Amino acid sequence: KEKMTVIDKIILTADEHHVMDIAHPSYWKNKRGEHPAPFTTISWWEVLSGEWIPFGDKDEVIDYLRRLIENEEYKHMIWPEHCLYGREGAAITPVLMEAVTCWAREGKYYEVVEKGLNPSTEFFGAFRANIPLEGDADTKFNMKLKDELESYDVIWLAGEAKSHCVANTLRQLFDYPEVVRRLVILEDCMSNISGCEDLAIPIYEKAARMGARFETLFRLLRSLFFLQY
């Protein structure tokens, strides 16, 4: 709040998922009618063999899982039901929203990028689904958002989870090095999903090679203090 006058724009992302989402347990059953436990990984050959039976069209699901591998996306993992459409869990964290609201009262506008409503594809990054789907423009790369980021000199990046949504947002910008070079990644304003600490290391290493900066919030605020005085 103390340094909010230096912020020109705040862009938040909000995940929203249906209960019957391809990454939720209810979407899947095995031959015994059991749902997978959270953090189970499912491959296309396990669907082909009948080990896991999807709620959606089997052939389309197999194609989706194959394309994850072909496009070097993360393995398909089952998560606990989260960010359910219309429920409290899909809302922006209240303490963050309070700070954003105070900032907006100074005559500024924030933006919320909603993602994840198509139940047939994961949507980690802010710009596109893990596998964009034909017939759903909302799953394809958000060029408007990328173009807006290009209008700013410095872009602070933070959020949850470091290993998944933040990392994939970063990776989806690798085709736009001029944006990556403007990024300041706030390392102490994010955390990994437990057990996935090493998953995104190559992404962050590549971002550093491309010119992204890594800072803590304390160092960032201290640098802003010296710039102002």
Label for each model-derived stretch:
Residues E2-I11, H17-Y229:
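Active-site-adjacent betaalpha module
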